[in-house]
Amino acid sequence: MSIKEQSLMTPYLQFDRSQWAALRDSVPMTLTEDEIAQLKGINEDLSLEEVAEIYLPLSRLLNFYISSNLRRQAVLEQFLGTNGQRIPYIISIAGSVAVGKSTTARVLQALLSRWPEHRRVELITTDGFLHPNQVLKERGLMKKKGFPESYDMHRLVKFVSDLKSGVPNVTAPVYSHLIYDVIPEGDKTVAQPDILILEGLNVLQSGMDYPHDPHHVFVSDFVDFSIYVDAPEELLQTWYINRFLKFREGAFTDPDSYFHNYAKLSKEEAVNTATSLWKEINWLNLKQNILPTRERASLIMTKSANHAVEQVRLRK
């Protein structure tokens, strides 16, 4: 079978970095280097070049999709003779722990909000929809944080369902990585944004991923465009360990940190601890629950060293 025939059999169009960068067209750079520095994660190199070559073409594509969706809504309103409610366009971002989902989400939020249309863009992470630690302890799930059974899926589905139904004000719980728990009574109100970016491990999952909790509607049913941030497993492990070491010298030194004891570890002890956490929890979750959802995404971004995207696959 020829390469051309093989490419016809995949549901994705494939682009290397230079091919994808060319699709930026004439979209202007709207972020400064200082702003980009504020958007990047603790363990990531995010350059002006990366934003220009990867994220500007992606924001251009998303702007086309969002405009098309608005035209479709207008057609329906014209047909029904109604003035429709403001229904947000939902973009989901999935991928492994430490792959850089949060940075991708923040960069897209910044870029999409600066298009000439001045759309309002909200960012919500699914961490807030984890069951509180007290519930996880009662169910013996503290070492399963991030696994499907650790989430209040009914609340998460209701959140996105209400947004798509035009409910004016919808609340989302907020998670604190400092205390490693959902903040009691710390809900955030989301008031009919034009775009919602939903970032988390579980946003591409469907019924087959929740055999323990059968229900018929899932987050993915309400998502308009989904992104999976991918990277080789050996890089993910390295990034996870490096991030842990930086937290050990930073966030973990806070006496209020749930992981304050880790700040006292030697570097060797910290590397061993992070490696165990990766293998026993995060790698397992990746293999069992996250990676199997990759091919459900509208777009797959594959990273190489230094968090640089080397390939983009776009669903036809």
From Swiss-Prot:
Top-rank EC class of the record's enzyme: transferase
Single Gene Ontology MF annotation: pantothenate kinase activity
A GO BP entry: coenzyme A biosynthetic process
Example of a GO cellular component annotation carried by this entry: cytoplasm
Residues binding ATP: 95-102
Keyword Transmembrane applies: no
EC numbers on record: 2.7.1.33
Keywords for this protein: ATP-binding, Coenzyme A biosynthesis, Cytoplasm, Kinase, Nucleotide-binding, Transferase
Substrates-to-products reaction catalysed: (R)-pantothenate + ATP = (R)-4'-phosphopantothenate + ADP + H(+)
Pathway noted in the entry: Cofactor biosynthesis; coenzyme A biosynthesis; CoA from (R)-pantothenate: step 1/5
Main localization, broad class: cytoplasm
Cellular compartment(s): Cytoplasm
HAMAP family registered for this protein in UniProt: Pantothen_kinase_1
Family listed: Belongs to the prokaryotic pantothenate kinase family.
NCBIfam families referenced in this protein's UniProt entry, alphabetically: panK_bact
Protein name: Pantothenate kinase
Originating organism: Salmonella typhimurium (strain LT2 / SGSC1412 / ATCC 700720)
